Amino acid sequence: MKLLVAAVGRWRGGPERALFDHYVGRLKGGLAVIEVEERRPLPVAERKAREAELLLAQLPPGAFVVALDEHGEAWGSERLARELDQRRLEARPAAVFAIGGADGHGEALLARADRKLALGVMTWPHMLVRGLIAEQLYRAQCISGGHPYHRS
C-alpha cells in the first residue's frame, strides 16, 4: 500500500524538511508528498472549498483517507498501526494523510475522509505536521513488523 501526504502549501527548506526526510528515508516503500496551493485571495469559506477540491482531485481511487483535523480522534501509535494493517488487508491502494490549509479542511474533504485524526489539542505548524506524520508512519511500520523502535 502506497503512503501519501496530501497537503495544502509548498515545502520550504529548514529543520522541518530535514525531520521529514529523515523518517521517509527509514520507511520501507517511502512516503510521497502531493502539494496543492490556491494563491488567489479568497474569502475563508471559498478558499477552504477550493483547497478541498484541489486535494480531492489528487486522491488515488479507493484510497484510505485520513484528514488531519483538530476535531478528529486522538490515536495512539498502536491504533495507527492497526488501521494501516487493516487497510492493507482490504487491499487499499494507498493511505493518504491530508493536511489542510491555515483555516483547516473544506467540508468536501472532511466528507470524503474515512477517518479524522487530531494530533492532540495543541496547534502545530503545518510543515512540522508532515514530519510528525512521517515519524508516526515509521513507528507504525515498526510496530507491525515487531521492530524494537517502539516501546509500549
UniProtKB/Swiss-Prot annotation:
Its job: Specifically methylates the pseudouridine at position 1915 (m3Psi1915) in 23S rRNA.
InterPro entries assigned to the protein according to its UniProt record, in alphabetical order: Alpha/beta_knot_MTases (IPR029028), RlmH-like (IPR003742), tRNA_m1G_MTases_N (IPR029026)
Assigned EC number: 2.1.1.177
Coiled-coil intervals, chain numbering: none
EC category: transferase
Similarity remark: Belongs to the RNA methyltransferase RlmH family.
Residues holding S-adenosyl-L-methionine: L68, G100, L119, G120, V121, M122, T123, W124
The name this protein goes by in its record: Ribosomal RNA large subunit methyltransferase H
This protein's encoding gene: rlmH
PANTHER family reported in the protein's UniProt record: METHYLTRANSFERASE, RIBOSOMAL RNA LARGE SUBUNIT METHYLTRANSFERASE H
UniProt entry keywords in alphabetical sequence: Cytoplasm, Methyltransferase, rRNA processing, S-adenosyl-L-methionine, Transferase
Cellular localization per UniProt: Cytoplasm
GO MF: rRNA (pseudouridine-N3-)-methyltransferase activity
Family matches, as SUPFAM superfamilies: alpha/beta knot (SSF75217)
Pfam families, alphabetized: SPOUT_MTase
Catalytic activity: pseudouridine(1915) in 23S rRNA + S-adenosyl-L-methionine = N(3)-methylpseudouridine(1915) in 23S rRNA + S-adenosyl-L-homocysteine + H(+)
GO CC terms in record: cytoplasm
Keyword flag rRNA processing: yes
Keyword rRNA processing: yes
Complexes and interactors: Homodimer.
